[in-house]
C-alpha cells in the first residue's frame, strides 16, 4: 500500500530535472528578448535630420516615416522631465548633410525632441521589467526547490543549485546592462551639435542651386553667410573660384561686393605707383642726411599697405563661395592684412620718434612686432570671424594702434611737449583722423541702417544661440526663416517708395558703410605715407 501511495504521490510532484529544464529555457528566452531590446536602444543613432523642405510636418508623416530613422541616437531625458530647448544628447562624430533640409512643424520643435526621448524611455522601461521578471523567476525557483515539501535528497538539491547558478549567470549580465542603461538615461545632457549643424546648413542646398544662375537675397543665404542684416540683395553664392574671379568685372551682374572690391583694388594700384615712382622722387629719398634705414622703413610700410589692400580684394572677391570652411579662411586673410598694416604704421612712428634712443626704439618696435604676430595668429581663430565678434575686432585693432602713443609719451619725456607734438602732428591730421572716421562707419552700419524699403531684423543670432536656442527655429521662425524680405511699412502707403532714392535701396550695391570704410582706409594709408615723409624731413632735413 505504501508503494502504491508513493507511486501516486510522485505523479503530482514535478521532476526536478524537468522543472529546471523549463526554468532554464524560460530564462534564456527572456534574456534574448531583453538583449534584442537593449540592442535596438543602443543602435538608435541620430545621424541626420529629416530631409524635408522647411514646412510643416503633420503627425501622419511623423508616424509613417518613423522607421526611416533607425539610426537615431537616443536623446536621453533626465528621468521623465521634459527636454527643454537647451538640453540634448551630443551626437559625436556625426554631421549633417550640407544640402539636407528639416521641417519642425507649427507646434514646437521640442515636441519632436520629447517624442524621441519618450519612445526610448518606454523601451528602457520595458527592458527593465523583463529583467525584473527574470530575476523573480530565479528567486521563486530557488525558493520552491528548497521547500521542505519537495523532500529531495541532497544530491538532487546540489544538481538543482548548479542549474540555478547557471540561470543566475544569464540574469546577472541583464541586470548589469540595465543598471548601465539607467545611468545613461539619468546622466546630464549637453547641447547637441545636430541643432547647430541643421541651422548652419539651413538653405544651403537651395542657395547652392539658385547661386548657379542668379544672385541671392539675405534670407536665401545659410546663417553663416549672414553678416550684415542691412544689406539685403546682391549676394553671390558661387560653386567655383573662376566665377568669383570673373565677378570682379561683374561678369554675372553687379553684386553687393563690387564697390568693396574696386575701392581697394584701385587703392592697391595707387600704392604701387607711390612705391615705384613717387617715393624715389621725394626729397627724403634723395637727401643724404636721412639714414638708409629710414628708406627701408618707408618701403616696409608701403609693402604692408599693399598687402592689406590685396588681402581685402581677395576676401571680397571670394567671400561669395559656397564652401564655408574656405570662406572662413578667406576672411582670416583679410584680418591678417589689417593687422600687418597697423603694425607697420606703428613701427614707422616708433622708428622716427625713438631714433635718438636706440634701446627704447628697439624695445618698442620689438613689442609692437610681437603684438602684430600674435594678432595674426589670433585672426585665424574661428571665434574672431563670427558676426558677434565684430566689436572685439574693432577693440583689438584700436588697442594695437595705441602702441604708437607710448613712443609719443616717451618722446615728451626725452624732449618736451611742443617738439613731440610738432613731430607727431602730421600723423594725427593726415592719417589717424581718416581711420577714426572709417571705424565709425564700420561699426555703426551707416547709412544702410536707415533704409526703409524693407523690414530689417533687429539682431543676428549669435553662434551660441544657433547651437542651443530652439526658439530660433520655432517662435522666431517667421523672422529668420522667411522666404522673401518683408516690405517696409512705408511701402504699403506709397508703393513707389521702395524704388525711390530716399528708401536707400541702393546701399545694396554702392555707398554702404563698408565701402566708406574702405575709402577712408585708403585715405589713411596715403595720409600716413605723406606723414612719414613730413616727419622724416622734420627729424633729419629741417632740424
UniProtKB/Swiss-Prot annotation:
Residues carrying a glycan:
45, 123, 153, 256, 319
Gene Ontology molecular function: any one: signaling receptor activity
Q: Where are the transmembrane segments?
A: 260-280, 296-316, 331-353, 358-378, 396-416, 426-446, 506-526
Q: What does this protein do?
A: ADIPOR-like receptor involved in zinc metabolism either by altering membrane sterol content or by directly altering cellular zinc levels.
The residues on the Cytoplasmic side of the membrane are: 281-295, 354-357, 417-425, 527-543
Per the UniProt topology annotation, the Lumenal ranges are: 1-259, 317-330, 379-395, 447-505
The reply on keyword Membrane is yes
Which membrane topology term applies here? Multi-pass membrane protein
Family membership, please give it. Answer: Belongs to the ADIPOR family.
**This protein's record includes keyword Transmembrane:** yes
- Tell me what organism the protein belongs to: Saccharomyces cerevisiae (strain ATCC 204508 / S288c) (Baker's yeast)
Location of the protein in the cell: Endoplasmic reticulum membrane
Keyword terms of this UniProt record: Endoplasmic reticulum, Glycoprotein, Membrane, Transmembrane, Transmembrane helix
Q: What is this protein called?
A: ADIPOR-like receptor IZH3
An example GO CC term for this entry is: endoplasmic reticulum
Question: Which InterPro entries does the record cross-reference, listed alphabetically?
Answer: AdipoR/HlyIII-related (IPR004254)
Which superkingdom heads the taxonomic lineage of this protein's source?
Eukaryota
**Tell me, which GO biological process terms does this entry list?**
intracellular zinc ion homeostasis
